[in-house]
Amino acid sequence: MSDSDNGSADSFDDEIDDFVVTTPRQSAGAWMLATRKASYDKNIVTRRLESDSVNALGSDSFIDRDEEDELPSPDHALFEGIDFENVEKTSRYKVFVPKHSNYQENIFVTQLTQPPSPPEMIRGPRWKKPDPEPPTPKPPATMTIPASRADQYRDDEKEIEAAIAASLRSFEEENCGPTSAMVDKSSATRTAAVPSNAQKQHVADVPFDVDDIPDDAFDSDLSLSPPRSNSQAALRGPVQSQFSTNRPLGLRQSTLFGMTARASEASIPRGEQVFSPPDKNEAPTHHKLDEEALNTWIYPTNLGKTRDYQFNITQRGLFHNLLVALPTGLGKTFIAATIMLNWYRWTKSSQIIFVAPTKPLVSQQISACFGIAGIPRSQTTMLTGEAAPGIRAEEWKAKRVFFMTPQTLINDLKSGIADPKRIVLLVVDEAHRATGGYAYVEVVKFIKRYNKSFRVLALTATPGSTVESVQAVIDGLDIAKVEIRTEQSLDIREYVHARNTDVQTFQNSDEMVLCMDLFSRTLQPLVDQLCSLNAYWGKDPMALTPFGLTKARQQWMLSDAGRNANYGLKGKVNAIFTVLASLAHAIDLLKYHGITPFYRHLVHFRSNTDGQKGGKYQRQIVQDESFKKLMNHLQPWTKNPEFIGHPKLEYLKQVVLNHFMDAGEGSGADGNHTRSATRIMVFAHFRDSAEEIVRVLKRYEPLIRPHVFVGQSSAKGSEGMDQKTQLSIVQKFKKGDYNTIVATSIGEEGLDIGEVDLIVCYDSSASPIRMLQRMGRTGRKRAGNIVLLLMQGKEEESYIRAKDNYEKMQEMIASGTRFAFHDDTSPRILPPGIRPTADKKQIDIPVENTQADLPEPKRRARPPKRPPKKFHMPDDVETGFSKASSLTGNKGAKKTDKQTTIRKPTPEPVAIPALEEVLLTPSQQNDLERRYCHIGGTSPQFIRNPRVDAYPRLQSVPRPTRAVKHGALTSRMIGTLQKMHQVGADCESRYKDILALESSKRPEDSVLVQESARPRQNKKLSVGVSRPSKAQPPQTQSTLAPIREGLVDDGILEPTVPNELASLLGHQNPKPFYSSQISQDDLESDFDLPDFDTLINRNAERTTPRKRNRFVLGDDSDE
């Protein structure tokens, strides 16, 4: 690098060919003008130009291009009031000046102010003093004695210009080498003759070599350069092309940490932007769209002034899967409501879902959307797990807009109550939770299986604390674009309220030191045992942490000593680790939360060792003398109502009291207690700490009206709050019934309570997400104050680390270079060619939306039954069973189900044989007659049907077969013949007697019924009717034996009236035994035995088996 490179400076303009290297004498116009005015007013000799001047203008001589364009050109009237005697001498520091630009008079700037920026960003030019050069001869300065003031001024001006030209030429020859050869001697003469404007224009035309500028002077991309005026571009046009090859293309300005620098203020888009749906080749959506409404999208103006960042983010959210990261209180709900309104207009029957982690957040979003978007209340519902599944199923069929928790949504989707194909928009609040297996991720995955055409809008204030966590959110929700704003962003700066953060650090009190000393003596023996076994390396018991002990246990179990140890040693080490991990939580309570929570934990630990409970090492600690002494000290302290067990708690009490007293809380003129509009929220990590804070603050009621605010799950010594109780506490807090809320992590996210003026963080969190969420509870509607109470040491370091981590993550997310977005899975949904335009108008809020209660479905005395589970199938799914071979093969080659079609025979030509081939030959004719036409013997031959009475014994049993088994018809035939042989000889006479008696009576008047063989009675018999007995016939008798025995042997026939018989049979008409007995003509005709088909089909007529009726017997006796 040449010497001239050392004198170069950095600039943020990418057009490096528009600058030349010259002396400060050309750029410091203030020095020349001061010299001219001094020679005109005071008649002094022009100062001699010296090359080794010291105390130069230095960095003050650098004039920013933007500031030079904004300041007006000076005239002679501005010379008045300037102290020309104190003008400093110039130096040889090099500066960059444009070659082609409209000339403006140089202005002397005393000092340039740098805008506030992070330390890793490059802030302005870097100056380096050139190496000393040997002195060169300078032209002697001419001294002129003016005759008059006007003539002397003109002469002095010419002499000064000539001296400047000579000095410039010598300086160019000295530092620029061959470059000065391009300037001939005549140019200096012409420069002295032309006026000042022409001289300066010529100086701008001096050629310039890019190699004279150091490589690191410009490191910015072309897109990061500030906008240039048209006049400047026109002047640079003819000269720009000759240096275009040396321009740094594709570069991006980066910070000292290797991150991409944030764009300059000039390149940040300001004002309202116009975005259009992306041009994608995708299948048409299955949602029914309203073509008339697609031409516009509505931006509500109900809230007053239009905010540019809300307008731009809303457009992006309509056309892309968007992650919106805005500081709390900047209108994320307004953006969500506007996007929901437009998708509600664009679709006819599709459903829109807003999900939030808790019911208080869900109810808060409902009230905001009702007042902003104007979506009808009749089409909106809020569903939680408390509603019955049957009621939720009815709501899913009738409504279009749903506000619910993600757990309820995934349950309804899995059970088939909700149809995933109808969902067109999913709005996710507190989207930083969408990592791992949280319900947000499961919902998006489930919907994607059935629906490829739905929009996702994710809202959060803190996307994540690490690059991996932010990428997990992007992957879990299929995010395609990110819109992030920080409190330093230009377009939101005017809407951010001031937040004054006060960090207070504390040291351990004397009581805490005493407790730590006694507790260390108690735990020291167990810690020493672990150290002797090389299972733990720490010596100080007060440095124990649950996480550190867990990691130490895992490392020891994986080491050679842990793997090779016997079971007794392993059990001992695990028992010691378990006891110390339980007591390590007590150490954290003592250090950061107070003595009272610490004492409660020890009492619970001691109660687990009563009697035979607890292990060896637990009893060892409880029986230790130091532990007993510690408990004796703590018991009277905690029973004292005035005791405050931590310095942070004492400071917290003073801060809260001072805040309310300054706000005029409770100072009424008439002696009544007035309620101010100010509110305070206190955040604590554990419930024990929250309850202790409430106990201390309640001493000052009614000035301080505190209440605890915890989650739903119950813990030891503390009951949880259901969602209904949480809502009531928030409402009372807004109304003023409570003016102080002491909340755990449940109050960190999403609660929109604009009147909170003071946030007190009782403990610090290493997570930047939780820290920013806590701070975001204040400063929403007016300026707020934040007080952080930290203990010196670990807690203070955690806060600093979380703050730095948050700032770095915001820079990474804004740069967009470290994350992979899913633009391919973000559907367009809208038809191609549709480009909605913005329509700003006042939204008419329906009267039904002004109701105060939430749109929850009403409970019913008898809720509807849960509908059967419905299986929603994705598009193009293969239903039915599939062969295993088709699962691994090509699915495209799978055989499709074809309808069986009957093939029609097609005529085929048959070769007609010759007549000689068809007719029998004489020999064949003789063989036919001999074998088949003539029978030997003299007896006549007859062709008869097969006889069933021939060979009865052989026909009644199956004969042996070899290759072919007997068929079903043969088996039935054999069974029929066996039954026929079982019929006795008196069968014919018995049937004749029965039919003769039956024909003597009219069939419609009476029916012959055997007394001993009546059918089984119905269940509904009258009381006192006994069940008739039934005789079991032997196996060898015929099927007609019971009838023969009952009728023939007893000879008792009882006619029964049909009405009485119907009552006994349950109004059932008797069924004839044979089908031939149905007609009246058959009864009156001569008796014929049943034919063969009737006997065979006897069993087939009984289509349904008889049911065995049970008799209900009753006793009327008084006994």
From Swiss-Prot:
Known partners and oligomeric status: Interacts with the MHF histone-fold complex to form the FANCM-MHF complex.
Statement: the UniProt record of this protein carries the keyword Cell wall biogenesis/degradation: no
Gene from which the chain derives: mph1
Compositionally biased tracts (Basic residues): 859-871
Role this protein plays: ATP-dependent DNA helicase involved in DNA damage repair by homologous recombination and in genome maintenance. Capable of unwinding D-loops. Plays a role in limiting crossover recombinants during mitotic DNA double-strand break (DSB) repair. Component of a FANCM-MHF complex which promotes gene conversion at blocked replication forks, probably by reversal of the stalled fork.
Pfam families, sorted: Helicase_C, ResIII
Keywords assigned by UniProt, alphabetized: ATP-binding, DNA damage, DNA repair, DNA-binding, Helicase, Hydrolase, Nucleotide-binding, Nucleus
Organism encoding this protein: Aspergillus clavatus (strain ATCC 1007 / CBS 513.65 / DSM 816 / NCTC 3887 / NRRL 1 / QM 1276 / 107)
Motif annotated as DEAH box, chain positions: 429-432
Protein name per UniProt: ATP-dependent DNA helicase mph1
GO terms, molecular function: 3'-5' DNA helicase activity; ATP binding; ATP hydrolysis activity; four-way junction DNA binding; four-way junction helicase activity
Limits of the Helicase C-terminal domain: 651-825
EC code: 3.6.4.12
Source organism superkingdom: Eukaryota
Domain Helicase ATP-binding per the UniProt entry, residue ranges: 313-481
Stretches with biased composition (Polar residues): 186-200, 222-246
Localization per Swiss-Prot or TrEMBL: Nucleus
CDD domains tied to this protein: DEXDc_FANCM (cd18033), FANCM_ID (cd12091), SF2_C_FANCM_Hef (cd18801)
